[in-house]
């Protein structure tokens, strides 16, 4: 390897090369880091592309950071130049457009429909993530937005932040959701208090809070079904 080149995926053992694993086992078998490494192609002088990918995803926001980062913010990460930053933004934008197209056809009829959108991803998060699912008057999903990362409390779940994206999307109603990293979806008193405060704020804003789902490890709790709204 020359001094100016990064560590390439080809320099990894065959069983660790994401591209080879994709061809052998299929794209669904790859982790987020492996998928990202394929896009990056090369790493730095001391890190493989897979190492760089793992580092980028190791922060508290993980994929959410990549989804929301600007070109400048991406270039501040070691191993990411302008070309790689542009390629990542393009790939993420394609994914966002596909997700928006898919979500626009999704109708929410019950809490299980919402859990189907969120459970597989949120069950593995190692910090609490609070999200809103915005709906139109036909209960079709307009979008899913991340409100905060960290233990749910009244300061993190301020109505101004919670309703910002639903207002932008002209939502008629929202469903709240957050995960419990412990895996136990039992609502705490703080969860219930925050939810009721947001229900009241929704009444004032004309955006109904239909439910609040708490995501655990493979299971969830609906505050509406428990009559806790």
From Swiss-Prot:
PANTHER family: DNA REPAIR PROTEIN RADC, UPF0758 PROTEIN YEES-RELATED. This is UPF0758 protein Moth_0536. One of its GO terms (molecular function) is metallopeptidase activity. The lineage of its organism: Bacteria, Bacillati, Bacillota, Clostridia, Moorellales. Belongs to the UPF0758 family. One of its GO terms (biological process) is proteolysis. Zn(2+) binds at residues 178, 180, 191. Transmembrane segments: none annotated. Pfam families: RadC, UPF0758_N. InterPro entries: MPN, RadC_JAB, RuvA_2-like, UPF0758, UPF0758_CS, UPF0758_N. A motif (JAMM motif) lies at residues 178-191. Keywords: Hydrolase, Metal-binding, Metalloprotease, Protease, Zinc.
């Amino acid at each position: 390897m020359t001094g100016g080149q990064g560590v390439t995926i080809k320099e990894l053992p065959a069983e660790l090369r994401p591209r080879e694993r994709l061809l052998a086992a299929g794209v669904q078998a790859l982790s987020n880091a492996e998928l990202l490494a394929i896009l990056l192609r090369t790493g730095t002088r001391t890190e493989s592309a897979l190492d760089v990918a793992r580092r980028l995803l190791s922060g508290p926001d993980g994929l959410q950071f990549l989804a929301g980062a600007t070109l400048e913010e991406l270039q501040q990460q070691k191993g990411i130049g302008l070309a790689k930053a542009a390629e990542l933004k393009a790939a993420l934008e394609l994914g966002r457009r596909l997700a928006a197209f898919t979500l626009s056809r999704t109708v929410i009829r019950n809490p299980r429909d919402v859990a189907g959108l969120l459970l597989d991803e949120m069950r593995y998060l190692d910090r609490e993530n609070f999200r809103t699912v915005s709906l139109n008057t036909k209960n079709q999903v307009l979008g899913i937005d991340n409100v905060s990362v960290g233990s749910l409390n009244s300061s993190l779940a301020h109505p101004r932040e919670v309703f910002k994206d639903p207002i932008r999307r002209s939502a008629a109603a929202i469903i709240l959701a957050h995960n419990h990293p412990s895996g136990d979806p039992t609502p705490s008193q703080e969860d219930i208090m925050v939810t009721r405060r947001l229900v009241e704020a929704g009444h004032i804003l004309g955006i109904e809070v239909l439910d609040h789902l708490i995501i655990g490890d493979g299971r969830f709790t609906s505050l509406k079904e428990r009559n806790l709204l």
